[in-house]
Amino acid sequence: AFAAISALAISFLQMRQSNRQALFSRRLNLWLTTEKLMDVYSENAKHLKPSDEVQLANDLSFSWLTNTTSLQEIGPAISNVLDGEWQLKLHLKLDEMRSQASEARYIFKGNSGLAICHFLDAYQKLLFKMYQHQILIKTMSDMAQEHHLSLKEACADVHEEECREELFAAQDALSAAYRELSTRKIRGKIKRQMRLVNTPKDIVDTFLS
């Protein structure tokens, strides 16, 4: 009987360790992806500023924000906005980012999971808004050429200014999410959860606001 109980206890401990290792791997992979996106955003945030001008460099900004391993496959989508194949690739990647955002809430505890979720969700929403805006710019350009309109007239016809404000709102949302995730407190919580073995203090600190 003792041998059976010992074997059961060992099996339980092995399973627990295996689950802990699996959770650690999921956290590590998601955090590495998130950190790379944070680095890309940090390098290019200076280019994402509201202005009264038509956002003709929108495609360039999109290319900068997708210049990372996890997003490079959709970079060319901004130059092929009406191509069905590229549209599919973009939507699949944005769906993946939404799934990662949701996953963060479950595999990271407390506010750290929410902060990662907010950042990933805001990032994919901005990419989609930039893609939509590029369609608008192309439509506006084609209209101006076909009907011999000025840039200002074409902008008015497609309500570019209103759409531009929506783009800026998405930029502001990502900026706020980045600031939230960049705080020392949140990053400290994430770092503690990246350990395979947590001390009692780590566990308490993780749940403290």
Model-predicted segments: where are they?
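Terminal, low-complexity, charged helical segments
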Residues: 2, 36-53, 76-78, 82-84, ...
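Amphipathic, membrane-active segments
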Residues: 19-61
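N-terminal, helix-rich and Lys/Arg-enriched segments in bacterial and organellar proteins
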Residues: 7, 25-42, 99-102, 110, ...
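An amphipathic alpha-helical interaction surface
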Residues: 62-209
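Membrane-embedded hydrophobic alpha-helical segments
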Residues: 1-25
